Amino acid sequence: MIKRQNIIAVAQSWVGTPYHHQGSCRGVGADCLGLVRGVWCTIYGAEAETPPAYTRDWAEASGRETLIDAATRHLTPIAVADAKGGDVVVFRFRAGTPAKHVGILCARERLVHAMEGGPAIEISVTPWWRRRIVAAFAFPGVTD
């Protein structure tokens, strides 16, 4: 049984981790996907899936929803409106392009994520961010 508070605490422990493309090592370096992968590994004890090498424009080349497809393989899809602390949210920054960013909610209005240019941080989910959420997922077996 996995408690939401445990997921939130693990996600928050990544705050301050430097950005590193394709990284997934708390305190050393991670990108947005690496942060979620690292939280998964801490919670479940092993990686769900090792992603292939990817470039910064990886999804644009194929036009496929690679990030959402991978999330669907390992996480439980939920309605965006139902997402709360401990859930994973996926963002699309530009209409007509694949979703390319992911983070973990610490509360309905708080998010831990990693973006190029700075360390992993916890931010407010402002209206700008909220409008860009296109999918939400729960970790398997999570309980309140």
Where are these regions (language model features)?
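Active-site nucleophilic cysteine motif
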Residues: 24-43
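A broad structural signal for alpha-helix termini and local helix breaks/kinks
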Residues: 15, 43-44
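Short helix-to-loop capping/linker segments positioned immediately adjacent to catalytic or ligand/cofactor-binding
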Residues: 18-27, 77-78, 100
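Short, solvent-exposed loop/turn segments at secondary-structure boundaries
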Residues: 24, 124-125
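Non-catalytic ligand/cofactor/substrate-binding and regulatory segments of enzyme domains
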Residues: 1-17, 125-144
